Amino acid sequence: MLKLFSAFRKDKIWDFDGGIHPPEMKTQSNGTPLRQVPLAPRFVIPLKQHIGAEGELCVSVGDRVLRGQALTRGRGRMLPVHAPTSGTVIAIAPHSTAHPSALAELSVIIDADGEDRWIEREGWSDYRAHSREALIERIHQYGVAGLGGAGFPTGVKLQGGGDKITTLIINAAECEPYITADDRLMQDCAAQIVEGIRILAHILQPREVLIGIEDNKPQAISMLRAVLADAHDISLRVIPTKYPSGGAKQLTQILTGKQVPHGGRSSDIGVLMQNVGTAYAVKRAVVDGEPITERVVTLTGEAVSRPGNVWARLGTPVRHLLNDAGFCPSADQMVIMGGPLMGFTLPWLDVPVVKITNCLLAPSVTEMGAPQEEKSCIRCSACADACPADLLPQQLYWFSKGQQHDKATAHHIADCIECGACAWVCPSNIPLVQYFRQEKAEINAIRLEEKRAAEAKARFEARQARLEREKAARLARHKSAAVQPAAKDQDAIAAALARVKEKQAQATQPVVIQAGSLPDNSAVIAAREARKAQARAKQAAHPVADSAISGGDPRKAAVEAAIARAKARKQEQQAGSEPAEPVDPRKAAVEAAIARAKARKQEQQAGSEPAEAVDPRKAAVEAAIARAKARKQEQQAGGEPAEAVDPRKAAVEAAIARAKARKQEQQTGSEPAEPVDPRKAAVEAAIARAKARKQEQQTGSEPAEPADPRKAAVAAAIARVQAKKAAQQQVVNED
């Protein structure tokens, strides 16, 4: 009867399809306790040791850091990394990392000082006094990630679970051959693991907590049972040994009987899974206040003389760990990071240990066997029988090889856990997992490109829609403006139309002239006065510079006005007559001399004191001469062609003009002119008028006799002498 009740109390477990039973090879390393490894002289800490983006750097080259000090900031899925020991940051540069191709990733390189000093640690021994959010934030900021191999940020995983989680599963199966890191951790630190499990349960509040462990770990099972002897909140489930029972989906099915849907997660069925190493890291982060700076790593293989499990600081070079374990490499020695089924071969040994590194396998040549040649698939279906995910590996192989991405996706290649069971049983030695990894990478690249194209298309369509809206709005504005013009535009149009109509009305009105009456020119007079006023205003606004600088000379103004009137009359007469008469050289010479004298006088007056007082007598004489010249030009314009030029007279007049010019230049620099005598001025004006009349009479008399060049030259010389003598006599008289 007792045996019957014991059978009813036995916890039920389930099984999954497929799976294999490879040699375990765990006894090489699980028999010795955990031990510390001497500090390496230099540490390389990659910024990205988890799923997601790398954190933001918060240190610089040359900074001194302590163990546990944050090197990056963690926001969202960006998980921070911490210094594994105290030392100095000597570089922040790309460095080869734990990857099949040893890809270079940005890393912080620290030179250890050997002191291994910690930051100030603050633990929460009473973690129940803190809120769920505070605990999750602490776990995240202390860099805790999944240590079972995935490297998913634990804080993000706990935050995403929320209230949907009904079952918390602790994965202690550790099913892959050679790896004993979790086994040794459970043997040496069972109490700390259980305390970390209780912290996770406090955060999630599930209905049940299950620990799944394979039956090939008797020492670990006994230690956990001893710790859980009086506990009723955690159940320990021992499961049969079969690879890969440690897979998340496979262990969930074994312990709960539920299957995770295709393309889904275990949280979709109310299950959340954590590794025993992660539970231990949670305890150290929350209770002890220690960020994750080290983890347990299995050093095993026949090429290692002292296999076992060690506490390896993150960032320690693989070469340093293997040398500490007595590594004896052969000619073609390989080193595998991870297990023999899911691990990968390292191109060289300078890569650092990261959070997902659980094993370093250094097998001998006889241990792993010689590599065999890949052969063609014989469609034996052994791979399909061994697949724990119920897939068809042979079909996925053909799809991957033929680049048939759609068919590979339709056959759920994303559900492949890359356990390597298919490749283990394949008689043709086909590396199926390598094909599947490459195919999934290509599909991810295609999806990423499609996502970028969709985003670009969405941006383009949004831009086109915006341009169409702007165009429609612009057309609407133009249409409304055409239909309803603005008030000021209407006023301007109306005013313009009124002006046009007024001009048309004025043009069409007949001109009525009454006999015996004067025409009404008031409108014309008003328009002329308006134009004059406008001209005066414009002249006042823009005065002539020379007029503003020096005062006007009435005498010069009178002479220039008379000359201008004469020229105007002459031009009016010439406009309707025959072509202009020949130029009189004598007159041209006289006018040129007078112009030069005036120019010299004006230049001297511009730089000297203000102009001297105007002499009315000289002004009257020059005005009379100008009027006489004007009358003479008028008569010549309407009469016969000009008489022949008399060179003698021209020379005499030129000499007289030059003498007058010299006299004017001398008078410019002398004392102010003497007071003007009105009587003398009147006499000189009368004499000038008489001379002008005489010249007019001579103009209409007999034509001038032909000019004799010799006589003209003699007369010109006599005239020059007389002009000089007259100028000197004038100067003496004035003195």
Swiss-Prot record:
Membrane topology: Peripheral membrane protein
Enzyme Commission number(s) of this protein: 7.-.-.-
Residue positions binding [4Fe-4S] cluster 1: C377, C380, C383, C426
Sequence ranges assigned to domain 4Fe-4S ferredoxin-type in this UniProt record: 368-397, 407-436
Keywords in alphabetical order: 4Fe-4S, Cell inner membrane, Cell membrane, Electron transport, Iron, Iron-sulfur, Membrane, Metal-binding, Repeat, Translocase, Transport
Listed cofactors: [4Fe-4S] cluster
Binding positions ([4Fe-4S] cluster 2): C387, C416, C419, C422
Protein role: Part of a membrane-bound complex that couples electron transfer with translocation of ions across the membrane. Required to maintain the reduced state of SoxR.
Subunit and interaction comment: The complex is composed of six subunits: RsxA, RsxB, RsxC, RsxD, RsxE and RsxG.
Family: Belongs to the 4Fe4S bacterial-type ferredoxin family. RnfC subfamily.
A matching Pfam family: SLBB
NCBIfam families: PRK05035.1 (NF003454), rnfC (TIGR01945)
GO MF terms, alphabetically ordered: 4 iron, 4 sulfur cluster binding; electron transfer activity; metal ion binding
GO biological process, one term: electron transport chain
SUPFAM superfamilies assigned to the protein according to its UniProt record, in alphabetical order: alpha-helical ferredoxin, Nqo1 FMN-binding domain-like
Gene3D superfamilies in alphabetical order: 3.30.70.20, NADH-ubiquinone oxidoreductase 51kDa subunit
The UniProt record lists the keyword Magnesium: no
Protein name per UniProt: Ion-translocating oxidoreductase complex subunit C
Stretches for region Disordered: 534-716
Compartments it resides in: Cell inner membrane
The record's free-text note on cofactor binding: Binds 2 [4Fe-4S] clusters per subunit.
GO cellular component labels: plasma membrane
Domain of life: Bacteria
Alphabetical list of InterPro entries matching this protein: 4Fe4S_Fe-S-bd, 4Fe4S_Fe_S_CS, Ion_transpt_RnfC/RsxC, Nuo51_FMN-bd, Nuo51_FMN-bd_sf, RnfC_N, Soluble_ligand-bd
